[in-house]
Amino acid sequence: MLTSFDESYIATAFKQNVHQLYQCAEGWLGATCEYGTLHIDEEQYFLEKEWIDKERFIPVITALNRYVQPLVRYRMDDILVLKTKPCLCGSAMTAVEKISGRCEDTLYFPSKDQALRPVYADHIHQALRVVSGNVHQYQLIQYSVHRLVVKIQASNFLQAIECIEQQFEKLFFSHGLKRPLLEFVPMEALPLNQTFRRTQRLSKCT
């Protein structure tokens, strides 16, 4: 699935609505309907929700109708946000508001009481949408709870740094978190044999 940052970029470039498939190495899991809402294919999978908070959950799926690779309570690494209102398409299958990101890519920072709190990838994407006109690509790498490297590809590098710092200041303040050291570096072209991950947590924060 695309991040909101990438979806907006593609929709603007092609002047079309973007519809998506939700799948992983285990196969097809769902797709967006005509209204753009992602639905889990519960005709093929039995879905259990491992709740993280009141709106986010980790999907645990079971599929016994698969002979080659049956899945029994397979815990995925994705974090989904449940859609609170019924979708206009009328489907009874679970509707997902958005994908917050992957568990392994959730960033953690200390709060004022020193407890580590999560910052999900979608929070970061939403904060940086403001600078999407100048920033063409970015990547965040967390080396520790006090150090965050921000790689950016931008039309105006210095202006992008200033805008991103302002957005991060708002983000950490709204979450009641201590602001880490931000290190900005130009983003180099990614080798074609590497998978691009926009958010990476290299430190063992949890």
Predicted regions located by residue number:
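Active-site glycine/GP-rich loop and adjacent strand/helix microenvironment
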Residues: 1-206
